[in-house]
Amino acid sequence: MQYHPWRWLAAALLALNIASALAANAPRVRVTTSMGQFVIELNPERAPLTVANFLRYVREGHYTDTLFHRVVGNFVIQGGGHAASDMRLKPAHDAIFNESGNGLQNKRGAVGLARSDAPHSGNAQFYVNIADNPDLDPVATRWGYAVFGRVVEGMDVVDRIGAVATGTVGPFKSDAPIKPIVIQKIEEIDAAAAAAPAPSAPAPASSGAGPALPPLPAAPSSPAH
């Protein structure tokens, strides 16, 4: 997907306009998966463009019945791009500007925008860090991976997904959960609703099969589509 700077400028203006309204009450979304639920608190103040982009996909229902197609133990889980029905990559909007310089770090529980080696190539796929991953943060000589939120409830579900058995499945050459992990839906919730505990998922089957985490670019330490 090509990065168009002029489109980013227009999108950035819109994102900045809504950021101030959202920042006071950080928006939250509930991710319902075949292994349980977890809640993400978004940070529109630090990552206005990326949050607006993510919420666009949420509101369009893009994530319904998609996969956590890549799981890397002690690293990340990644998903939101491939349909659960046929494992094909779903159409997505244009890529957005990389907001990795926003000061948010890829620490355990942080949620970021997956991309390819090209710095401004992220669109729909996201990942959750299941460990501290400073190698994904930007440095003076290269772009990082943009964090735009954090898991505030249900990290145990994320950990269970991160522990499933993986291998070669369909089009995925490695790191794909042997037993597909489906994102059944992602929905916006208010702060009051978020305070209610999410239902726990049943314990994983004794087979150990489970979800997968996000695909990374050439570097083994980075999330990509």
List each language-model region with its residue ranges.
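Cyclophilin-like peptidyl-prolyl cis-trans isomerases
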Residues: 2-6, 13, 18-225
